[in-house]
Amino acid sequence: MPQLTKSAELFELAKKFIPGGVNSPVRAFKSVGGTPIYMAKGEGAYMTDVDGNTYLDYVGSWGPFILGSMQPRVTAAIEYTLRNIGSSFGTPIEMEIEIAELLSRIVPSIEMVRMVNSGTEATMSAVRLARGYTGRDKIIKFEGCYHGHGDSFLIKAGSGVLTLGSPDSPGVTKGTAADTLNATYNDIESVRLLVNENRGDIAAIIIEPVAGNTGVIPAKKEFLVALRELCDQEGIVLIFDEVMCGFRVALGGAQELYGVTPDLTTMGKIIGGGLPVGAFGGKRKIMENVAPLGSVYQAGTLSGNPLALTAGLETLKILMEEDPYPELERKAAFLEAGFRENMQKLGLNYVQNRVGSMACLFFTETPVVDYKSAITADVAKYGKYFHSMLDQGIYLAPSQFEAMFTSYVHSDEDLEKTVKANYNALVAAHQ
């Protein structure tokens, strides 16, 4: 068991000045219990905490580090920009055009794109754009999907909202809640019912094509195809939230993987290379409604800043040059097979969901295809499992309802260590 003396001291101090002692709720370890761990350094596939303990990292800053932490080329590019260009100007820069052109080549749906500073900004802006474009007010989202902390999305949400056991948030007005309709993930009839009941009022349907904030739940291809057809029939804007799965499950994201093209796409995480960034883009006829070309307002002081764009550009260039996706698939499949073999040895039959290098081990035997099946997972057992893995030097998400990310820099030795630790942790979860 790692000694966490300094982490405990820092957490007590933090609680005096920061709500709950953290700047994002899931970091507080409320779901799994214990002391939140304060990290001091990350490099490659490893992190070291303030007490000197080292961990094999499967959180990857919640998704951005597909190439590992402190990737040498990305780090060098950031340093060059900081020393020779600057951190921000509040003016247009050439780099904005470079990344916009690159994204339009990589992501099937993107003809025009606007850079922002976070995934939340991207999804909020995309929904506002859809409303402005259609002249309609209501949106459909899916139970358990998380699209950031915008008011419209905190109705039956996933991620930290679900982790804390309350899928709704106080502070969301009744009017906002009334304009947010929730359907069942992977259930097209639930969507059709809402559309029929609100015909002519639905501006957008927003979905994570690989839901990564209720554990990991892949959409069925036929479900996405049906959504596309329904949106075309009803004049509804289809938004894919690819903040997490974009550039992760395939270079062109889930829309490339599934062969289904949305009207708008939101992005983040990997396109910032570990720095704060987001983007939304899509069909030209819709994006031309964004100010200053159109009347749908969106702005940001640090949007398109050189540091974030540098990190994102270098990350995308590496992904294009090295094509890590077959290797990521091999590594993640090795873990999945190893975990399955361990469960067979122990007479367990828990569910594993995986799409590429995004995965989740659910402590339930119920197939997980939506929010209701996800919450059948035994959170207490996951907490024991988490702490056993932590004791063995493996850092997982401190929540049953988050993804496990395999990175390009996880070595075969790292993977073997993880499979061995998984066996011990499964035993510990049942003691």
Swiss-Prot record:
Keywords, in A-Z order: Chlorophyll biosynthesis, Cytoplasm, Isomerase, Porphyrin biosynthesis, Pyridoxal phosphate
Gene of this entry: hemL
PANTHER family xref list: GLUTAMATE-1-SEMIALDEHYDE 2,1-AMINOMUTASE, GLUTAMATE-1-SEMIALDEHYDE 2,1-AMINOMUTASE 1, CHLOROPLASTIC-RELATED
Main localization (coarse): cytoplasm
Catalytic activity line of the entry: (S)-4-amino-5-oxopentanoate = 5-aminolevulinate
Cofactor: pyridoxal 5'-phosphate
Molecular functions per Gene Ontology: glutamate-1-semialdehyde 2,1-aminomutase activity; pyridoxal phosphate binding; transaminase activity
CDD domains attached to this UniProt entry: OAT_like
Pathway field: Porphyrin-containing compound metabolism; protoporphyrin-IX biosynthesis; 5-aminolevulinate from L-glutamyl-tRNA(Glu): step 2/2; Porphyrin-containing compound metabolism; chlorophyll biosynthesis
Residue numbers bearing the N6-(pyridoxal phosphate)lysine modification: 269
Origin superkingdom: Bacteria
Protein localization: Cytoplasm
Designated name of the protein: Glutamate-1-semialdehyde 2,1-aminomutase
HAMAP family the UniProt entry points to: HemL_aminotrans_3 (MF_00375)
Origin organism lineage: Bacteria, Pseudomonadati, Chlorobiota, Chlorobiia, Chlorobiales
Organism: Chlorobium limicola (strain DSM 245 / NBRC 103803 / 6330)
